[in-house]
């Protein structure tokens, strides 16, 4: 299937083989394309041992090796998305293109073989009638397309795609906004999981770990609540910097200087909650941490599934009267891991009347 349209954007399906990537680049240069998007799936099998996080990243590396110098945009679906992946890559591609209205509303998909017809239809469903979408199908070298029924792989590919195309044509009528929302939550979940893996790696590093040296041999990762998007709350932010600097109590004789910077007000479990936000005076000019604010808090899980003395959150300084407070990122004070640390105690006004089943759990 070859039905290209006049366009300056090429979308390459990231699963295609190297010969197709090479052919696509030759066409990209010949027809003077300006923008390149590569779609792909996350590589979830043996992910700790593979070089690339997705098929799009792997394809992009091949494209770079072939001498491509322009920007490459990767439309990769999250690890949490397991169904309707071709349509979801279409939604992910649309999310990229919506950020670049100057690219226009036309593009060509570069695919391989019989799958290209269904890809084209899926992308048309994802983009709607406002976009003009073309398709360029390279030859599938795994079987003879003129005699596809002579081999098992040819028969399987053609028959499967034929049935799938009928299904999409007759029965698949998705709502773009619903799929976009699922992708956004999936990207968020992937980002939190990535941060948690990095945190585990930090704790396992003997040169950096807050754990005692003799505890490292028994460390197999921190324990976390499952990631739940509902614990990423939009809060009202009230700036309040009129109070003087004060010495915050810790579990030791140390008295670090803080000031109240404001308050966040939000609802969780249908309960109105309020937390005071603090600024560390010693860090306010620090290039890494100067733009962050500190929220120590306690909730109904403390002493049961989370650290008895409470947990912490950091947020960037709000630039408006609202801010995201993400309890999935709640972390323990270092005192939860070793007695040698000095940690701020949670002020009494920051005790929540609800259970926050999010973030890190008690270390055992």
Give residue ranges: language-model regions:
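Terminal leader/tail segments of proteins
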Residues: 231, 246-249, 322
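A transmembrane-helix-recognition feature enriched in membrane-embedded lipid enzymes
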Residues: 150-177
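Short, low-complexity, Pro/Ser/Thr/Gly-rich segments in the mature regions of secreted, periplasmic
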Residues: 167-179, 354-363
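Acidic, glycine-rich flexible loop segments
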Residues: 294-331
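A structural signal for short, hydrophobic/glycine-enriched beta-strand patches
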Residues: 1-150
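Extended, aromatic/histidine-rich regions of cofactor-dependent oxidoreductases associated
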Residues: 330-364
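Start-of-domain marker
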Residues: 2-33, 180-229, 233, 241-242
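Mid-length scaffold segments of soluble, non-membrane domains
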Residues: 39, 64-74, 86-89, 96-102, ...
